[in-house]
């Protein structure tokens, strides 16, 4: 990876962590769940409003590291407007990007590619995947808190 691309990815993560998109809660959400990463101290709530089988709105309320907040911000931007099945596919794809020995291809201009550097730091993978795991719990109506441990 070139230095310019690495710098761009770092800039994307910082942008999303400093001014996260879709931060907040949704009153009368169709799905909501809480997540916790005890090792890093990340805590997140994810809220989903559906219109039929489509995600009409998604928000998160997070207290955590830059990686966790940036991942949640990118996640909500990507998934609003998608069907539940598309969201499940995107969630699986993202988690595979960070955890699979043979990750799927990702375009350099895909904002999620900014989080690929996390692969080098196994403890930080949990920071990046926590929002996505919490989203899955929100969509499935799980009342159990998601935890990375």
What are these regions (language model features)?
Residues 19, 23-59:
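Structured beta-strand/loop patches that form or line metal/cofactor-binding pockets in enzymes
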Residues 62-69:
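Short, thiol/selenol-centered motifs that function as redox-active sites or metal-ligating centers
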Residues 40, 65, 127:
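Functionally engaged cysteine thiol sites
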Residues 44, 73, 126:
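Active-site phosphate/pyrophosphate-handling residues
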Residues 71-83:
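Alpha-helical support elements that line or immediately flank enzyme active sites
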Residues 1-27, 56, 82-149:
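C-terminal binding/interaction regions
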Residues 69-70, 89:
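Alpha-helical macromolecular-interaction surfaces
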